[in-house]
Each structure stands twice: as C-alpha cells, then as structure tokens.
Amino acid sequence: SGTVGAAMEGFLFGIPSIAFSQVDKGWAEIEAAAATARQMVLDMKSQQLIGTSPWLLNVNIPNMPLEALKSIKLCRLGRRHSAEQAIVQQSPRGETMYWIGSAGAAKDDSEGTDFHATAHGHVAMTPLYFYLIYYYILGYWAQTASKLTGVAS
C-alpha cells in the first residue's frame, strides 16, 4: 500500500515508522482511527518504546466507533488473491491512464492474521522487515555478474 510505502521510506532512513490504515472504504469513523493512532503513539512515547533503532509497524484499524474497538493484536500479514486487472482509459487530455484494479479477495484470513483481527474488531499490529538487498542470493549474483559484459555486441 502507499501508506506502508511511505512508512518504509522513514524506516529506510533509520526512523522508527508506523503505517496507520483504516480498514474498509469510507471515512465514517476516521476520528476513531485517528484517536487510536494518536493514543498508540502517545503510549509508545510515554513508555519509552520508540527507541532510536529503526523499526516498521503496519497498523490496521477497523472502521468502527471508538467504543466498539477492541484491543491491539500482534498479527502476521494475511494474504490476498491477485488484484483485478488494470483498466486502461484516456484522460481528458488524451493521455493513456491505467487504473489499478481493486485488491483481490482474502486468500488467508485465518486466526493470527491482520485480516482476522480487524474482522473481529481488533486493531491489528504487524511488525514488518524490509531491506532492498536480497542477501541470500548475493553469492550467486557475484559469480553471475562476472559473466556479464553489460555492453551490447
């Protein structure tokens, strides 16, 4: 998601980062989501849980009134089926535009996932880990790179 992408930027710059998202479409309970996010950050700060080492959290908040929200659950990520296909359209200026299709339906929404937690009214918190270098395959590419010229013949 774009929210996780933005938080990832902070993480990659060494900043503890949180991606807060409200589950489902609509803004009906955006105040409840904002209050929940604010309280989580204040709690982390007051309990000195933020620290200086970078970390990345994905937090999904159900779209429901504040009094209906349940506790925070630590979760793994659920999985989705593939997204719908992109839709090709023309802009008013005649340029080609691509609308990315809707996210796919849940493929794994079992207990322990963020999908399951939010479907049952809980705030889902998932620690993420992301680095752009695939360290486990560096050895392979070190050998392979020496066989490449990088110049068209």
Where are these regions (language model features)?
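Glycine-rich phosphate/pyrophosphate-binding loops
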Residues: 11-33
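Electrostatically charged, flexible surface regions
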Residues: 32-153
